[in-house]
């Protein structure tokens, strides 16, 4: 399964994430939002994703339909496979 999603933004800390989520939830269903931890420039970060789409075209269309305020952080279309690989790459061994 290689679904697509929209990466809305990354947040460096919990307060920043909370502030962003409070804005995002005004425009899209919170149940369509996913957050995961990763590294950005070798620092811990939380990435916010929106939606799950069957193909790239559907995700790109949804991205075009986002309100301007949600486009402020330059969202991009990503594959679920790419996100899983990123998470696996940045997981620390137990």
Predicted feature descriptions by range:
Residues 3-9:
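Active-site-flanking beta-strand signature of metal-NTP-handling nucleotidyl enzymes
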Residues 1-2, 13-94:
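Extracytoplasmic
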